[in-house]
């Protein structure tokens, strides 16, 4: 099954903090700047935390789009098929002039 990808421009157009967005970078990367509302589940912990992935459409983001694609593939292999990779990742988000927030998980 092919994994859906969304461009930074299209994602920014759809983004509203109500989307399920998971950032799969490591904790220190996440805390140094992430898309507002993104929940951090590092790829290194991902398989053990699959039960935390919502059953709705979920967007995945990382630094550039590579690790988030791996997370999407893991989800598909586990039967979670409504996953979308944010191509370009957080670097693309920042390059597009979008804001990031610092610190830990959203409340």
Range-by-range predicted roles:
Residues 1-20, 27-57, 67-107:
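Rhodanese-like catalytic fold shared by cysteine-dependent sulfurtransferases
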Residues 61:
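Short, surface-exposed ligand- or partner-binding patches at beta-edge/loop junctions that are enriched
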